[in-house]
């Protein structure tokens, strides 16, 4: 078991050593940061086959998914950061009002210090390494905790980092006891991806030390479908987004709100596309994943025991396999609608009016993602305007996560904070405002003793100079 890979580490001592390394100033320079990022990139390239193999063992990820959603994603992220870092680190000049005569103003990005990154099991490589890249780029030291559920990927990451980076700079934690003890320590930032329950616990512990956090959570991300939906490419995107990684994606469409006028056609086209992707027996498909653990298999299987299954429904506990499954005539009080599915189930709820569908979404927590499949621009915008979600996509699925020029993150129950692209640098930095003034002269009226003339002059100057 991965929990046995490393002995219990003294959490306080580990954080102390990281803070000592940070305080040495080694992480401050552009040269150091680029050197470490390039080393990490080379390390990932050299271990691509091992990463792919670990993901296959943990989640039965196909080679395409391993590259497309994990390895390539991270490499492109590093490339973007390396190419942009010099610019990001430069002080940002801002306008200085005349009132601050002979002065200049800027914002400089200072590293925060010691960062704690906690990752989930569903994309165990990408969701750990991506925030680590941002923390490294910003000049921090990082203690990182991969999920023990994705045991093979966890072990590989531990080996890659421990053999190539100073433990006081980058450290992987695989021991559960140490993981919990670390949450009692003072960090300069905590970045967590996972479920709401654990995220809430981390938020409470962080608050004791006034530690800022990013919480990437999840929720039930809805998918709106109207009668103008493109049943060709748009349907392919939708089915791919739902069943990639066997549905174990935090931004996967969770349930589908489909106009009753096209519901029958939508279902038939969805079934057709599932068969096109995974064949008559998805269990034999090399492209369809497996549920991560027996516990999660039992949970997801229980969500559709009493549901109306119109396609799929097959399970095999020995392989932790659940077929791509479509559920029709789903009610809001059904088990599948009570929690985030995180599995290959596709509940369909028909609607007669768009406002009726929007009301369903508003009745729950704010989701991490929201999808609209329609060719009607007015419909698209109405849904976006009337709902609140972390992010949104129109006629696309999941792909917004890889658009590094867009912020990614939740709102309300689906999370706190955003990252990706420059935001990954910004969240692990303190944007320090600086005003510099010349000592050649100053406004004499600012200094005591004060009188009515000075007050009147100050008011006039403020109106003119500010």
What residues fall within each predicted segment?
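Rossmann-like NAD(P) dinucleotide-binding subdomain of oxidoreductase/dehydrogenase enzymes
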Residues: 98-233
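ALDH superfamily catalytic-core signature
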Residues: 3-5, 165, 198-332, 394, ...
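Residue-level signal for inorganic ion chemistry
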Residues: 33, 78, 139, 170, ...
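Structural signal for hydrophobic packing residues in well-ordered secondary-structure cores
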Residues: 26, 41-44, 48, 59, ...
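Short, well-ordered beta-strand elements within core beta-sheets of diverse protein domains
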Residues: 20-26, 117, 223-225, 255-260, ...
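Conserved C-terminal structural/oligomerization subdomain of aldehyde/semialdehyde dehydrogenase
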Residues: 2-5, 28-29, 275, 322-466
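N-terminal Rossmann-like NAD(P)+-binding subdomain of aldehyde/semialdehyde dehydrogenases
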Residues: 1-106
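Residues at or immediately preceding the N-termini of alpha-helices
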Residues: 11, 30, 48, 179, ...
């Amino acid at each position: 078991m991965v929990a046995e890979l490393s002995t219990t580490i003294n959490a306080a001592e580990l954080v102390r050593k990281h803070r000592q390394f940070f305080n040495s100033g080694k992480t401050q320079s552009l040269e150091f940061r680029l050197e470490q990022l390039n080393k990490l990139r080379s390390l990932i390239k050299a271990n691509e086959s091992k990463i792919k193999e670990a993901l296959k063992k943990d989640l039965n990820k196909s080679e395409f998914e391993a590259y497309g959603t994990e390895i390539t994603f991270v490499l492109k992220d590093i490339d973007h950061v390396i190419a942009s870092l010099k610019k990001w680190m430069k002080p940002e000049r801002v306008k200085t009002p005349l009132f601050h005569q002979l002065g200049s103003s800027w914002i400089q990005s200072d590293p925060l210090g010691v960062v704690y990154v906690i990752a989930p099991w569903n994309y165990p490589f990408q969701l750990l390494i991506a925030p680590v890249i941002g923390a490294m780029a910003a000049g921090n030291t990082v203690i990182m905790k991969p999920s023990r559920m994705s045991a093979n990927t966890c072990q590989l990451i531990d080996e890659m980092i421990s053999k190539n980076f100073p433990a006081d700079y980058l450290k992987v934690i695989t021991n559960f006891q140490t993981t919990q003890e670390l949450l009692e320590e003072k960090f300069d930032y905590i970045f967590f991806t996972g479920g709401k329950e654990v995220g809430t616990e981390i938020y409470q512990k962080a608050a004791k030390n006034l530690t800022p956090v990013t919480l990437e959570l999840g929720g039930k991300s809805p998918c709106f479908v109207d009668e103008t939906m493109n049943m060709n490419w748009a349907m392919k995107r939708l089915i791919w987004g739902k069943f990639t990684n066997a549905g174990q994606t935090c931004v996967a469409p969770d349930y589908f709100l489909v106009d009753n006028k096209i519901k029958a056609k939508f279902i038939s086209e969805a079934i057709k596309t599932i068969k096109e992707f995974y064949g008559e027996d998805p269990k034999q498909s090399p492209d369809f994943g497996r549920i991560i653990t027996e516990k999660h298999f039992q949970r997801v299987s229980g969500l559709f025991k009493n549901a109306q299954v119109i396609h799929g429904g097959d399970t095999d506990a020995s392989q932790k396999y659940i077929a791509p499954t479509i559920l029709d005539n789903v009610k809001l009080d059904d088990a599948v609608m009570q929690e985030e599915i995180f599995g290959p189930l596709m509940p369909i709820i028909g609607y007669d009016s768009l406002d009726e569908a929007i009301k369903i979404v508003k009745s729950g927590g704010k989701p991490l993602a929201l999808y609209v499949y329609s060719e009607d621009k007015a419909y698209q915008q109405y849904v976006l305007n009337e709902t609140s979600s972390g992010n949104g996509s129109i006629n696309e699925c999941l792909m917004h996560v890889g658009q590094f020029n867009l912020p990614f993150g939740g709102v309300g129950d689906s999370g706190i904070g955003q990252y990706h692209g420059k935001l990954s640098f910004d969240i692990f930095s303190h944007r320090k405002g600086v005003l510099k003034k010349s000592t050649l002269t100053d406004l004499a009226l600012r200094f005591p003793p004060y009188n009515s003339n000075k007050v009147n002059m100050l008011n006039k100057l403020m109106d003119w100079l500010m």
